């Protein structure tokens, strides 16, 4: 099969996956509504808490006013939605139930099905979340100072953030090849993500050593960096360094996915799955 034929095959897969995902979400509207509430409530709670702290601290905390926190968490809501994955919850079930065996029989790598499913769901949910964020903006009056170059740089930063987060979490999900109880691994990962990605609080409010740790690990580059970038809180040099860090983690993620997948499939096949 030529490269162009492979691309056409993948395009058909992604198109069909979108139709399937859209039909499923329409059918299960109540579940979608509950999930969307969860996506909105978490950053909204952080926004209310830090806005209150800011107002009680002379109007500013670490350079963030109440309106600055509003801009941060409303943008975070969107960025987190774009980069969010749920694959770590699914792989344990797939392996325990044997459904992965069917995926291995297909000529296309299973990761493509997961990517297309993830993107398809976001095409459905993101417009809803944008409307909600717009309504919340009318209440909390966010203030930011983005520049043209920052907005333009935000686009590749967001794409890289999604790719790094998806590949990293897909790699961690493959731990299910060696243990069918990965909930502890997931919990440790999500705690680190909460603190070091900027979801709980902007990383600039942390002590210096935690900021350094956040810069070394991949979590900031999955969520916090695009938020800081589009809000105009980074210099051009910091933005370039951040994009370089994202590119480096993308390469690392691709290597890890290929390596761990190859090793995991061997283990899976060896036990007669």
Annotate each PLM feature.
Residues 1-273:
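Hydrophobic transmembrane alpha-helices and immediately adjacent juxtamembrane helices
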